[in-house]
A protein has these predicted regions:
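Boundary at the C-terminal end of the N-terminal hydrophobic targeting segment
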Residues: 15-19
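Conserved, charge-rich beta-strand/loop surface module that forms ligand/interface-binding patches
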Residues: 62-113
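Edge beta-strand at a domain terminus
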Residues: 123-150
């Protein structure tokens, strides 16, 4: 009875044995698309929690699940090999604001090279007016992070 109890107590530790955390330091560049004077570069440290089924990067969750409601669409992907991790998040929503049909789109793409300990992460945030047959970009924000992880 005691060996079974000990195995049951140790089982959670065995199932999380592939999980680990990284701290990545690098250069983050932010700017408004089409406005070169808005470019801002800072040194930043981000945390990453890696799991077999997904990862949390700077507060954002990446896995292979999708979520579709009447209000929004969220599609995520996460692929982990022994050498690399690639992940993506695509979020979109539509809203009627002051009689205009506004679409908000957020796209994140992450590449982590485990062997070289480096990361490249891009984030795009777009707000588009879809009221007329022509799309008008209201706001287009870009952010990229390139760094080294430990």
């Amino acid at each position: 009875m005691k060996p079974i109890l000990i195995l049951l107590l140790l089982f959670p530790l065995l199932s999380f044995s592939d999980d680990f955390e990284l701290l990545c330091k690098g250069e983050e560049t932010k700017y408004l698309h089409g406005e070169p004077n808005s470019k801002e570069v800072t040194i930043k440290v981000i945390g990453i929690q890696l799991y077999e089924e997904g990862m949390r990067l700077d507060g954002e969750w990446f896995d292979n699940k999708s979520d579709l409601t009447e209000d929004y669409l969220l599609v995520r992907s996460y692929v982990k090999t022994k050498d690399n991790i690639t992940a993506a998040r695509n979020f979109s929503t539509n809203a009627l604001i002051e009689g205009r049909e506004i679409q908000t789109i957020k796209i994140d793409k992450v590449e982590i090279n485990i062997l070289a300990n480096d990361i490249f992460w891009t984030h795009e945030f777009n707000r588009v007016d879809k009221t007329n047959s022509q799309l008008n970009t209201i706001y287009a924000f870009r952010k990229s992070f390139k760094g080294t992880c430990k």
